[in-house]
Amino acid sequence: MSDKLKERKRTPVSHKVIEKRRRDRINRCLNELGKTVPMALAKQSSGKLEKAEILEMTVQYLRALHSADFPRGREKAELLAEFANYFHYGYHECMKNLVHYLTTVERMETKDTKYARILAFLQSKARLGAEPAFPPLGSLPEPDFSYQLHPAGPEFAGHSPGEAAVFPQGSGAGPFPWPPGAARSPALPYLPSAPVPLASPAQQHSPFLTPVQGLDRHYLNLIGHAHPNALNLHTPQHPPVL
């Protein structure tokens, strides 16, 4: 009799555990979708998205990727530029977070050689990927990547005092505007006190694509050949930074 009572008590508990795990899996997957789908990622800064919104944006995004009637000509170029916009936005967000981590958690100083090498490597990759890749958009102004030092603005006041700002002059223009509704990342510090060694020519011409080049080629193949196999993305690799 006591064994039966124990079994009855265990049943609802195990059911609750199963339900909790199921909800956790759903929430985890929705969270990943919110970070993966470009439209959802761009709206994260404006507040928390509802689950239904994330699912709707995911459906729209997948329909656009699988559509056999992809727009051609200028419309196609604008679509590719939009994909590149989201990549650049995410890239600069990652750079901002890395800089904040290095200066606040690791307590690195901006004159630290290792810190300067990391920033130089990331900025060199950003410059390589920011070149216009879409000829139909050639009428837009070329971005200026002459990185010049300037004081940090008020938007960066919440970070550590050592994080002085540096960004391309005239960064508001160029072929890659910030996604609508997304807050621009604060400027990044770059104050090396010594010459910064960059990657060697052999490393810069490595067989691996830079992230932006891989992204552009992926979507060019996707639009040219609307086929499920075109959705295979390979993680880009780079030579070690340090």
From Swiss-Prot:
Annotated Orange domain residues: 87-122
GO BP of this protein: central nervous system development; GABAergic neuron differentiation in basal ganglia; multicellular organism growth; positive regulation of transcription by RNA polymerase II; post-embryonic development; regulation of neurogenesis; suckling behavior; transcription by RNA polymerase II
Positions of transmembrane segments: none
GO cellular component: chromatin; nucleus; transcription regulator complex
GO molecular function per UniProt: DNA-binding transcription factor activity, RNA polymerase II-specific; DNA-binding transcription repressor activity, RNA polymerase II-specific; identical protein binding; protein dimerization activity; RNA polymerase II cis-regulatory region sequence-specific DNA binding
Role: Transcriptional repressor which binds preferentially to the canonical E box sequence 5'-CACGCG-3'.
Record's subunit section: Self-associates. Interacts with HES5 and HEY2.
Protein's recorded name: Hairy and enhancer of split-related protein HELT
Organism of provenance: Homo sapiens (Human)
